[in-house]
Amino acid sequence: MPTTIQAISAEAINLPLTEPFAIASGAQAVAANVLVKVQLADGTLGLGEAAPFPAVSGETQTGTSAAIERLQSHLLGADVRGWRKLAAMLDHAEHEAAAARCGLEMAMLDALTRHYHMPLHVFFGGVSKQLETDMTITAGDEVHAAASAKAILARGIKSIKVKTAGVDVAYDLARLRAIHQAAPTAPLIVDGNCGYDVERALAFCAACKAESIPMVLFEQPLPREDWAGMAQVTAQSGFAVAADESARSAHDVLRIAREGTASVINIKLMKAGVAEGLKMIAIAQAAGLGLMIGGMVESILAMSFSANLAAGNGGFDFIDLDTPLFIAEHPFIGGFAQTGGTLQLADVAGHGVNLA
């Protein structure tokens, strides 16, 4: 059978960043990711990327590589056309190794769509071939924040995402003021990365409203386990609230919809894998929740995969696929073409990323 999986390999790739990617819970200076290759019996090669982010998920490059090695036995000799059945087997075998499973699923789907000469965005629904991404200002002082905002606008990117720590509301507000003054037309997505409690989150939102700071989304202000607090902030803040760390599975999204924990779901494939991500999207859309597409610190490979999913499926209100802009060196060619904030997908087989 030409679509039988014949070979699988995993290779550590260490991608230097242009600046440390800092969030409230930690920072990275190098993206310690894993390149995954799946080869079919007809010679078709699919590429995937696993991007563990220890500060968020606890997963590491070493652990991810080991998980991929263990999972190979579930896939070798299997028909990639049954990828969702294979994804379920991977989830059952290594549920906690989400990045490893995601990298394998990406590589399988890239191989499948390359075999059939189909663009990945067509496979996911063909709704669109274009997205508009934001760019992130990582944690730092007011001077860094203002300079970063000006640099983002100079790139032609219109929306800005801001990482805040949540510990000192006055400090977070000072940074937002500096960003707003430097980029007065830019809508702001504020990512709290679980750093606030209810009192600080509501005080922060009240101040943003009083000062007319254009925050269009407040992402995961509270810790994952504070479901009641997230619901309170969603109900009382007056702003759209996104669940990121709180939305790691389809079950989580169902609970969010039932309990009013958030109004937007941030889909990051590295949190759950591709098959589970599609379930999360379906539940969110059925429940009337907004959608955001994001990622860990990923190269053009994984980001292009996510872009194909978001554009092909449609319905995503917030696009946060900017981490390739922070990667100084990588071994890839192809992927989405970026002009300003516009990401344009090509009509090529698979996700369009190849090894240089």
From Swiss-Prot:
It comes from the Bacteria. Mg(2+) binds at residues 191, 219, 244. Keywords: Isomerase, Magnesium, Metal-binding. It holds the Pfam family MR_MLE_N. Its cofactor is Mg(2+). Disulfide bonds: none annotated. Substrate binds at residues 136, 161-163, 268, 320-322. GO terms for biological process: peptide metabolic process. Belongs to the mandelate racemase/muconate lactonizing enzyme family. PANTHER family: O-SUCCINYLBENZOATE SYNTHASE, O-SUCCINYLBENZOATE SYNTHASE-RELATED. This is Aromatic dipeptide epimerase. It comes from Herpetosiphon aurantiacus (strain ATCC 23779 / DSM 785 / 114-95).
